[in-house]
Regions:
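Membrane-proximal basic amphipathic "stem/tether" segments
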Residues: 249, 253-282
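Catalytic core of nucleotide-sugar-dependent glycosyltransferases
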Residues: 226, 231-233, 238-260
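Short, Lys/Arg-enriched charge-dense amphipathic segments
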Residues: 63, 156-160, 212, 244-255, ...
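Nucleotide-sugar donor-binding/catalytic module of glycosyltransferases
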Residues: 1-238
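Short, charged low-complexity intrinsically disordered segments located at boundaries
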Residues: 58, 239-244, 276-282
Length: 282
């Protein structure tokens, strides 16, 4: 049973042969204080020792200390499964089914929460929001050096229309009520996350089918103007990047209409060029 004085959140990590990347992610989850956590790891039958790491973590989470205080005191539940799946988004759907928290957050292997009170602070600022979102810091995959804030920066106000210019919020910095979290559409192999976020936000918006714009506050969407997560820089290959652009274009045409999407992508291309050549362009 959840405690109304604490956020009860399911953190879902999907893995396949993550190697040593999984351990800092699990550690950052275990270090969270002031929050009730249901931690779910969905592994795709890894062959690199991941199962052994999961077993070891399950044995050690009880009694770990952070700054001399019990990390969870019984408020962390850890569950995992390791079995074949049909890809990343199929595994994420499994995680949604397994999740028992009031909220859901997806955290990749190698990604870490910014500090031990990052989730508790969200709840202190605003209890019961439908969505919480914030900034993400990109870190180097080797060594963990901070490379800068993920861009584009998230908007001050977020609704489903905000994503017409691309993925303006990192999914690792997006916490949504579990009852509002729709399944991922498995027809998309690379960019199902932006389709998912658009559909989840659109379902919150009573004016989604009309011209009126509803404010983030009215939708129950809370913006935390700070870093919530550190995530690994892992660029796509050039071939996969082309496939991602094509798939994303189809997704956004579906949601915003072909002509509007074509015009929106004009700005996306301009923004991409400016970001490469103009220092500190957001």
């Amino acid at each position: 049973m959840s405690n109304p004085e604490r956020m009860f959140v399911s953190i879902v990590t999907v893995t396949y042969n993550p190697g040593e990347l999984l351990e800092p992610t699990m550690r950052s989850v275990a270090e969270q204080v002031g929050v009730q956590i249901d931690y779910v790891v969905v592994d795709g039958a890894s062959k690199d020792g991941t199962v052994e790491r999961l077993r070891a973590f399950g044995e050690q989470v009880q009694g770990e200390l952070v700054q001399g205080q019990p990390v969870h005191g019984g408020s962390l539940v850890f569950r995992w499964v390791s079995e074949p799946d049909r890809g990343l988004y199929d595994a994420m759907n499994k995680g949604l089914v397994m999740a028992q928290g009031d909220y859901v957050l997806f955290l990749n292997a190698g990604d870490t929460l910014a500090h031990p009170r990052v989730l508790a602070d969200l709840w202190s600022e605003r209890k019961g929001a439908a969505v919480y979102y914030g900034q993400a810091m990109v870190v180097e995959s080797m060594g963990g050096r901070e490379l800068g804030l993920r861009k584009p920066l998230p908007p001050q106000h977020l609704n489903w229309r905000s994503l017409r210019f691309g993925m303006v919020v990192s999914h690792q910095a997006f916490v949504i009520k579990r009852e509002r979290a729709l399944p991922y559409d498995l027809q998309y192999r690379i960019c199902a996350d932006i389709d998912w976020m658009i559909r989840c936000l659109r379902a919150l918006d009573p004016g989604a089918l009309g011209p009126e714009v509803v404010s983030s506050k009215a939708l129950g969407v809370h913006f935390a103007d700070r870093v919530l997560v550190h995530f690994l820089d892992g660029g796509l290959s050039s071939q996969r990047r082309k496939a991602a652009w094509k798939e994303r274009f189809l997704i956004m045409s579906r949601h915003y209409g072909p002509l509007n999407n074509l015009l929106n992508h004009g700005w996306i291309v301009i923004r991409y060029v400016l970001r490469r050549f103009v220092p500190n362009f957001a």
